[in-house]
Amino acid sequence: MSSKVSRDTLYEAVREVLHGNQRNXXKFLETVELQISLKNYDPQKDKRFSGTVRLKSTPRPKFSVCXLGDQQHCDEAKAVDIPHMDIEALKKLNKNKKLVKKLAKKYDAFLASESLIKQIPRILGPGLNKAGKFPSLLTHNXDMVAKVDEVKSRVKFQMKEVLCL
């Protein structure tokens, strides 16, 4: 077998997986894991890599986003019915680990205003960072709905060592 897979072959395989899923109507959401082997890549020398990719469609429509913002962003979030918290509500959590963990569990992602993002570790402690949900930056000149859609359509990837082949 060749070391490279053509784009057409990959697309055909993905289409086949999706059509197989439609034939077997299941009452739960299935996840598909794509595993790729990298040739001539030394994980010892070239450290592991990770990042995010924005997809054309939203893979998780029930993905919940909360805006942590100043007054202007809170008003904007209220107008478009997005859950939001201002600095006073965050201070009420008072670095309580259980409450911060509960907040991190309640939402899948967070957006924070420029003025607030530097204060979040001081106000909430390391709870959001430990949960892997540190907020993305939300600026005043960017549209909030577009930013929420962007966060919903992003997926994270990371390279892990393969245990067995």
Swiss-Prot record:
Single GO term (MF): RNA binding
Name of protein: Large ribosomal subunit protein uL1
Residues that bear N-acetylserine: S2
Cross-link (Glycyl lysine isopeptide (Lys-Gly) (interchain with G-Cter in SUMO2)): K118
PTM-bearing positions, type Phosphotyrosine: Y11
Gene Ontology cellular-component terms listed: cytosolic large ribosomal subunit
Organism: Sus scrofa (Pig)
Subcellular location(s) of the protein: Cytoplasm
